């Protein structure tokens, strides 16, 4: 399992970390004294001391006494009344979360206070130049870099969003506490604020009481963008630019975007029936609406800042032209709308603060379409006259959903009244309002930037209104003269402002808030994050089955691969739609076709890739290309104009071991088809994207075999693309945990096969890792920088391949033994499934309400149909973390005993891929706890199956032994003392939580309908996840 500290391996000051833990712990103790009373707090402290003492004795090797103390601890917990057990679970969960906050603060503090961090731009640029890379090559490679982080809604974020925000506020207060200039009064106020936040934490329900909808999940992802990435991106790009200027003499071009963002939230329908075509459209429109709203705020702040009247002649003519246009219409922009006056009558929030300290805090925590309660009497009468009773009935009956904080929509009638108010804002304006507004300008020279930006804001406001109409499903027409559709349209006036300021001697103004806004528009575009669509390959086959059967052509899925390719290629070359308008299909097929129709409506300006999960053949890709083409032709015919944007790039996702082995041949076959090769040359700049999945391959064959098969699959895909002169971008579907391909970003990228990272990369960030890596601007900047430098290094100085063919052969042998051992245990042992259900809280994880999708692909109790997340999640809870290491020990042992131990040691020292694979397994082993897994077995597992647990623990010890031998380490995490200390600091609370979970599981399995017991169990799951710093 990975802590979020892993990407920042520098030592942090543990004295100050411990001081913060003591401060938060002391304040929490005071809060609890008031909330639950002193007698109960004495019990809490006794349990903590018992757990700490047992841990200390075990670390000292005094096992017998440690066992006695743990038995006493178990006995005391078993005698606890349910209410006390529930309160104890809450207490230790909050304690672990507060320790996590202290850790987050110290990573932030380290980033601020170290002059040159390892893996920073300054560090890596310097290394590359010293290694012989020329400044020009370095500059060009950075400017051409294309990295995209894709945020997903995989259900691994266990904390409610409310609690996440409170945790961030506490981290910021700790940061403020480090200031040396605080007065006594300031510090007292700060402590009071901390007490308030901790009290609020305690009095807030930790559990989600209902499952989130896909729109809820999308809203959470967009909040990360608004609260953190919106601020982090300009800071990150400024850092890259400054480093480039320092080492190459040239800054990063203003519109250059080495980093972009995508999302699966609202687009990932693989196994999730709740993600429909309607949901995808709503989420995409929500994303656009929010982008425009953020830009309006930034333009407001910019208009306040750019009060200068010095500008270029060209810019002055533009401002004059805007004024003339307004006067030609008979009314000035500055009279028509308060929002477009030369100086806003009400300054934007935080406008008085410099951009460097604007943390981008939300001014709309709810995504609601704004309405007003006040309406002048004359407008009330006018609206009553304008709308007859029958009109109101039609509106009421036809009202749809638009966005509110609960995912519902405001009524159409409200929106129509709001539009009326917008259009007739002069009617009923009071004398006070007129007095408050500045007088209109008569000439552009007074404030040319405010005039131009005033028009920009007006167009943005109208664009937002158009989106509100689209959300409501009301008719509207896009007018390029009055609104924006593409980022290039918005960039044009902003770049003119920038050029004018530079040419008139105001470069310092140009390079401030304006440059930040230009970089935001270049990075986030008009949608903040482009939405990927994902669907399983079999669903497309079902759709084509329905079509070919209707057309009396046979059943598509029954054809062999060659016949499928012949049919698909022929239809793709044709110019007519394949799907008849009159066709009647079942609901599942209709949903697939509706999704392609929405994709055609939104186009590539709003959407990213179409990802095909469980892809295995070239026909899987062509099937999507055909359905996409057909939907676009049909929509073009209906509307009489081309669909917006271009076709979506189609990305096959290879997941299982067999599919990974077929990835290279599948891509080679695909690129050998003339139509397809010409299509990607023409529409996608000769670029093929291929996704590889880490979760299902790991569950299928074990982590070690999955890692090796992924490595080979990437080599084969790269080779196939090179044969046809096609550029390749690999899309890595990594989870947060090591069992699902997670791990430190830098380590992961640096261990890819040579040639697989050629300046471009896509990678998912899931669940709790999104919040951990990008939830705070300072940590987000650091993570973006790590992505940039890791990809840069892998591009210019690729990692070494295996030194000799013998190393590849040894990997094959280790992988074969490991896979056979893993599968014989997990899939072939008839007792394993029952052991899994008894020894872990897997069955109870479904009560958590942490995701909108089901935990299984199909209604079966088998492990094959269980998703990878609950599979990993369940083993993480018991501290067995089995998916990440099972089979590894057997493989290493088998090869070592054949006389290859020295070869394995050389591979560890010289082959980055092999080294990183073992290092990740070592991190997992450091979080595993053999005595705790034995405790779960003794208390929860039937006696006839306990022998299986014993065997698994022997395998765990074997794995640890051989990992240490091959790495040359005497103990786990020998080279990562920071992580070891952080793990050890959490163990007293974590051990007590595990014992409490075992007791609650015992009671719950005897009384399944007891909601209080269920709540207590879920809180222990939260607490253990906080202590392990991972879920699934």
Swiss-Prot record:
Name listed for the protein in its UniProt record: Phosphoenolpyruvate carboxylase 4
Tissue-specificity statement: Expressed at low levels in flowers and siliques, and detectable in roots.
Molecular function GO labels: phosphoenolpyruvate carboxylase activity
Any one cellular-component term (Gene Ontology): cytoplasm
Keywords, sorted A to Z: Carbon dioxide fixation, Cytoplasm, Lyase, Magnesium, Photosynthesis
Pfam families: PEPcase
Taxonomic source organism: Arabidopsis thaliana (Mouse-ear cress)
Keyword Lyase annotated: yes
Matching SUPFAM superfamilies: Phosphoenolpyruvate/pyruvate domain
EC number(s) per entry: 4.1.1.31
Domain of life: Eukaryota
Record-linked PANTHER family: PHOSPHOENOLPYRUVATE CARBOXYLASE (PTHR30523:SF6)
Biased composition (Polar residues): 398-407
Primary location group: cytoplasm
Region Disordered: start-end pairs: 377-407
């Amino acid at each position: 399992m990975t802590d979020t500290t892993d990407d920042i391996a520098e030592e942090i000051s543990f004295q100050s970390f411990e001081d913060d833990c003591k401060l938060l712990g002391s304040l929490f103790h005071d809060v609890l004294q008031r909330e639950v009373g002193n007698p109960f707090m004495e019990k809490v402290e006794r349990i903590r001391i018992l757990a700490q003492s047992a841990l200390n004795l075990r670390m000292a090797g005094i096992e017998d006494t440690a066992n006695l103390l743990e038995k006493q601890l178990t006995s005391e917990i078993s005698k606890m009344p349910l209410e006390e057990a529930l309160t104890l679970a809450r207490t230790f969960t909050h304690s672990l979360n507060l320790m996590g906050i202290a850790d987050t603060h110290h990573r932030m503090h380290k980033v601020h206070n170290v002059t040159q961090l390892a893996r920073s731009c300054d560090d890596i640029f310097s290394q590359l130049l010293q290694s012989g890379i020329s400044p020009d090559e370095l500059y060009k490679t950075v400017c051409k870099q294309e990295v995209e982080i894709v945020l997903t809604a995989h259900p691994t974020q266990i904390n409610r969003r409310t609690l996440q925000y409170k945790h961030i506020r506490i981290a910021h207060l700790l940061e403020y506490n480090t200031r040396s200039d605080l007065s006594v009064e300031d510090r007292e106020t700060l402590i009071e604020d901390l007490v308030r936040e901790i009290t609020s934490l305690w009095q807030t329900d930790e559990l989600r009481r209902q499952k989130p909808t896909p729109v809820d999940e999308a809203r959470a992802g967009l909040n990360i963008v608004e609260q953190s990435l919106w601020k982090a991106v300009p800071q990150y790009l400024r850092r890259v630019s400054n480093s480039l200027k320092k080492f190459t003499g040239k800054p990063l071009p203003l519109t250059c975007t080495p980093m972009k963002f995508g999302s699966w939230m609202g687009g990932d329908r693989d196994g999730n029936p709740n993600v429909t075509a309607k949901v995808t459209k709503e989420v995409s429109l929500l994303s656009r609406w929010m982008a425009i709203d953020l830009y309006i705020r930034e333009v407001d702040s910019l208009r306040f800042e750019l009060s200068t009247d010095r500008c270029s002649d060209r810019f002055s003519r533009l401002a004059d032209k805007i004024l003339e246009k307004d006067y030609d219409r008979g009314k000035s922009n500055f009279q028509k709308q308060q929002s477009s006056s030369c100086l806003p009558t009400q300054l934007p929030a935080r406008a008085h603060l410099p951009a460097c300290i604007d943390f981008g805090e939300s001014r709309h925590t709810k995504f609601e379409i704004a309405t007003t309660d006040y309406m002048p009497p004359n407008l009330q009468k006018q609206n009553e006259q304008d709308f007859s009773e029958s009109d109101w009935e039609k509106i009421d009956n036809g009202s749809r959903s638009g966005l509110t904080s609960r995912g519902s929509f405001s009524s159409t009638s409200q929106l129509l009244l709001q539009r009326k108010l917008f259009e007739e804002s002069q009617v009923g304006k009071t004398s006070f309002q007129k007095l408050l507004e500045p007088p209109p300008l008569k000439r552009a020279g007074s404030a040319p930037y405010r005039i131009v930006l005033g028009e920009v804001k007006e167009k943005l406001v109208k664009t937002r209104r158009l989106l509100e109409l689209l959300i409501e499903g009301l008719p509207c027409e896009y007018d390029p003269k009055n609104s924006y559709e593409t980022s290039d349209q918005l960039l044009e006036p902003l770049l003119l402002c920038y050029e004018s300021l530079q040419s008139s001697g105001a470069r310092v103004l140009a390079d401030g808030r304006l440059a930040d806004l230009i970089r935001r528009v270049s990075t986030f575009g008009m949608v903040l994050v482009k939405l990927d669509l994902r669907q399983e390959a079999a669903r497309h086959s079902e759709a084509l089955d329905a079509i070919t059967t209707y057309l009396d052509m046979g059943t598509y899925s029954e054809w062999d691969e060659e016949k499928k390719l012949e049919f698909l290629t022929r239809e793709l070359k044709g110019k007519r739609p394949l799907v008849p308008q009159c066709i009647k299909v079942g609901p599942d097929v209709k949903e697939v076709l509706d999704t392609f129709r929405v994709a055609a409506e939104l186009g590539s300006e709003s959407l990213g890739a179409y990802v095909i999960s469980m892809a295995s053949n070239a026909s899987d890709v062509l099937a999507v290309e055909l359905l996409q083409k057909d939907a676009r032709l049909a929509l073009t015919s209906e509307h009489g104009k081309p669909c917006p944007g271009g076709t979506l790039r189609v990305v096959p996702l290879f997941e299982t071991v067999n599919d990974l082995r077929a990835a290279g041949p599948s891509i080679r076959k695909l690129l050998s088809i003339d139509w397809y090769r010409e299509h990607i040359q023409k529409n996608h700049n000769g670029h093929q994207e291929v996704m590889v999945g880490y979760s299902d391959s790991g569950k299928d064959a074990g982590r070690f075999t999955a890692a090796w098969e992924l490595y080979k699959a990437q080599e084969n895909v790269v080779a196939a693309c090179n044969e046809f002169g096609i550029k390749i971008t690999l899309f890595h579907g990594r989870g947060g945990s090591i069992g699902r391909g997670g791990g430190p970003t830098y380590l992961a990228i640096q261990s890819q096969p040579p040639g697989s990272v050629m300046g471009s990369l896509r990678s998912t960030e899931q669940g709790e890792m999104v919040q951990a890596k990008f939830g705070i601007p300072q940590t987000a900047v650091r993570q973006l920088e790590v992505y940039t430098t890791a990809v840069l290094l892998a591009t210019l100085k690729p990692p070494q391949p295996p030194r000799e063919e013998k190393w590849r052969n040894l990997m094959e042998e280790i992988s074969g033994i490991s896979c056979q051992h893993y599968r014989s245990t997990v899939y072939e042992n008839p007792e394993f499934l029952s052991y899994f259900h008894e020894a872990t809280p897997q069955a109870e994880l479904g009560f958590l309400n942490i995701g909108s999708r089901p935990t299984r692909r199909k209604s079966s109790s088998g492990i094959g149909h269980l998703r990878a997340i609950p599979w990993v999640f369940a083993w993480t809870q018991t501290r067995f973390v089995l998916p990440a290491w099972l089979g590894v020990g057997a493989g290493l042992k088998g090869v070592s005993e054949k006389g290859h131990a020295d070869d394995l040691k050389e591979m560890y020292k010289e082959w980055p891929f092999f080294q990183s694979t073992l290092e990740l397994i070592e991190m997992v082993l450091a979080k595993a706890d053999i005595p705790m897994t034995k405790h779960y077995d003794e208390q929860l597992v039937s006696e006839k199956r306990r022998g299986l647990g014993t065997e698994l623990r022997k395998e765990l010890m074997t794995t640890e032994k051989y990992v240490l031998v091959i790495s040359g380490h005497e103990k786990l995490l020998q080279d990562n003392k920071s992580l070891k200390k952080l793990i050890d600091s959490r163990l007293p609370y974590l051990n007590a939580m595990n014992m409490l979970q075992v007791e609650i599981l015992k009671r719950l399995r005897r009384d399944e309908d007891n909601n209080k017991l269920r709540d207590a169990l879920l809180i222990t799951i939260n607490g253990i996840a906080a202590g392990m710093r991972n879920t699934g």
